């Protein structure tokens, strides 16, 4: 019995010794090997970016869309330490360079970095990322992300805007970033010692961003941009912008800027990029010139001070305080009706009507038409313009303001003001987002600024601008009656503070059909250099070319 107990004790102590020895071996003698084994599996929680919301035009044409991509990174230590990398660093760099879009020398430098993490490429298209993975280079790994793609490249580029690393930089991408970006998900990734994933599991699924449907029509936008490009080639202006709008709703069918911006290949210079991204349809502050004359005329009509047929004795110049203001061309003293004053764009006539109203009444109508305030179009960078208070008027202000000098407006403000006249006197908020996730955008109600009868009288008078003897008489669209107003405004020289004799803004704003307007177009050309400086010969023909396409395209009946 004692012998049997002794055997059991011997066996027990033998097993205990073996366990102690194994512990000593694993914990002390083989700890480095164990650490290497543990390191063969690394667990990380990675963020999975949400697909950004798609932006389409009014007919569903995709203008901006997210697609899967990968950020490609490398652990240079793992690359250099791998004994199986027979191709060497130079060979690895040679294979990687064309896939990640970098020079071979740049990739080689990255692979030689004294760091455990280096980006080789960000937002690499999925197909190219897959090709990188297929190289089986140790330490090279990919992290899922999304990349924003613009299928039409330059189309509505300043409206859409661009993305930065932390969200939208400009345009709608910036203005609606909160709803476009969605909500990122998370995933659990187990990787081997070479950084290659062994298993991937979702922790939280990502939530895609909202889908934006715009009021923009891609075909009208394309036509508008093509016309502005032609203006650029012929007149070589500093820049140009155009807006096409439905006056009854305020829906913007096109908003174009020139020079164009390539969203696929934007400028690398920060200053150049910022200038190219500027949407001058909402940000350009300028003195409107003669397109502003409808403000004084509309106010005087509404107050009952004049009628369309009221006659005025108009010389070719007028003295206001210490200033002498001239009509564009010399002429003998003549009798002009209100309608003829608009059609021939008489400065003296507009000033005469403005003086009938007086400072306070004129200022009231400036504000009624929406000047001095943002329109609420929903695009970043919108300016308010600059409108004087009557207390800020000088003795000569009523010689400047009725003819569009001395106050600043934006193209979108001018388009909205004319849209109110086209829409029976009701001013509506211009808008460019039609729906979010299929739900129609909520829009404020319009409000009346002039009576329907006054709006109709102004529309009728504006037809004379495109009739024989008008300042845009050579512009026509077969089958359609047109109405509108030219503007040629001298810019203030920033060095002298005086009006320049070489720098002008040429503009035209009009609508059709004249008696029942369905479509409005505004064209503003900043500092045309060659050929002409006048709104009637620079901007008005561009208006005609845009409307010549858009009216029949939209199925608007001739009239």
Give residue spans per PLM region.
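Conserved, well-ordered alpha-helix/loop/beta-strand core segments that scaffold catalytic motifs
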Residues: 117, 196-240
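Short, small/polar residue-rich loop motifs at catalytic or cofactor-binding pockets
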Residues: 42, 47-51, 184, 236-240
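Small/polar-residue-rich segments within soluble enzyme cores
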Residues: 29, 73-74, 87-99, 109-209, ...
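Second-shell loop/turn segments in exported
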Residues: 41-45, 72-86, 93-96, 114-122, ...
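Short beta->alpha transition motifs characteristic of CBS
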Residues: 50, 66-77, 254-260
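Beta-lactam-recognizing serine transpeptidase/beta-lactamase-like catalytic domain environment
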Residues: 64, 191-201, 242, 246-290, ...
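Hydrophobic alpha-helical transmembrane signal-anchor segments
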Residues: 1-33
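Short, gly/Ser/Thr-rich active-site loops of penicillin-recognizing serine hydrolases
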Residues: 441-443, 540-559
């Amino acid at each position: 019995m004692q012998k049997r107990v002794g055997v059991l004790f011997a066996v027990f102590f033998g097993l205990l010794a073996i366990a102690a020895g194994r512990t000593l071996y694993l914990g002390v003698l083989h700890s480095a090997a164990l650490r290497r084994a543990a390191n063969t599996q690394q667990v990380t929680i990675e963020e999975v970016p949400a697909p950004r919301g798609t932006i389409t035009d009014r007919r569903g044409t995709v203008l901006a869309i997210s697609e899967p991509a990968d950020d490609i990174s490398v652990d240079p230590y793992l690359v250099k330490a791998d004994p199986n990398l027979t191709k060497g660093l130079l060979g690895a760099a040679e294979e990687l360079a064309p896939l990640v879009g970098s020079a071979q020398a740049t990739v080689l430098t990255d692979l030689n970095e004294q760091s455990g993490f280096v980006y080789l490429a960000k937002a690499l298209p999925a197909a190219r990322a897959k090709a990188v993975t297929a190289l089986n280079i140790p330490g090279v790994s990919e992290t899922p992300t999304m990349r924003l793609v613009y299928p039409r490249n330059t189309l509505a580029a300043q409206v859409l805007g661009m993305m930065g690393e932390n969200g939208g930089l400009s345009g709608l991408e910036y203005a609606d970033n909160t709803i476009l970006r969605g909500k990122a998900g998370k995933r659990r990734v187990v990787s081997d010692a070479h950084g290659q994933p062994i298993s991937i599991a979702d922790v939280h699924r990502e939530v895609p961003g909202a889908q934006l449907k715009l009021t923009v029509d891609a075909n009208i936008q394309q036509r508008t941009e093509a016309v502005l490009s032609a203006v650029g080639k012929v007149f070589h202006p500093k820049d140009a912008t155009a807006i096409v709008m439905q006056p009854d709703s305020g829906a913007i069918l096109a908003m174009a800027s020139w020079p164009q911006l390539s969203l696929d290949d934007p400028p690398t210079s920060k200053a150049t990029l910022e200038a190219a991204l500027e949407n001058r349809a909402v940000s350009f502050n300028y003195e409107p010139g003669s397109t502003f004359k409808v403000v004084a005329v509309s106010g005087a009509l509404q107050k009952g001070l004049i009628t369309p047929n009221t006659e005025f004795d108009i010389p070719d110049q007028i003295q206001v305080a210490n200033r002498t203001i001239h009509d564009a061309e010399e002429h003998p003293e003549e009798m002009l009706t209100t309608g003829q004053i608009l059609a021939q764009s008489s400065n003296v006539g507009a000033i005469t009507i403005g003086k009938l109203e007086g400072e306070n009444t004129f200022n009231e109508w400036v504000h009624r038409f929406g000047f001095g305030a943002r329109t609420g179009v929903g695009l970043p960078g919108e300016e308010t313009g600059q409108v004087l208070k009557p207390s800020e008027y000088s003795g000569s202000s009523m010689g400047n303001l009725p003819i569009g000098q001395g106050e600043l407006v934006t193209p979108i403000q001018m388009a909205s003001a004319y849209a109110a006249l086209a829409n029976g006197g009701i001013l509506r908020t211009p808008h460019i987002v039609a729906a979010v996730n299929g739900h129609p955008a909520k829009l404020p109600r319009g409000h009346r600024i002039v009576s329907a009868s006054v709006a109709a009288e102004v529309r009728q008078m504006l037809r004379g601008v495109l009739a024989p003897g008008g300042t845009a008489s050579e512009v026509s669209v077969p089958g359609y009656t047109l109405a509108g107003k030219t503007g040629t405004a001298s810019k203030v020289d920033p060095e002298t503070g005086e009006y320049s004799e070489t720098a002008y803004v040429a503009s035209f704003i009009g609508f059709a059909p004249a008696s029942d307007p369905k479509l409005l177009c505004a064209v503003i050309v900043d500092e045309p250099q060659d050929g002409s400086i006048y709104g009637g010969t620079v901007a008005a023909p561009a208006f005609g070319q845009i409307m010549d396409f858009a009216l029949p395209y939209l199925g608007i009946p001739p009239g």
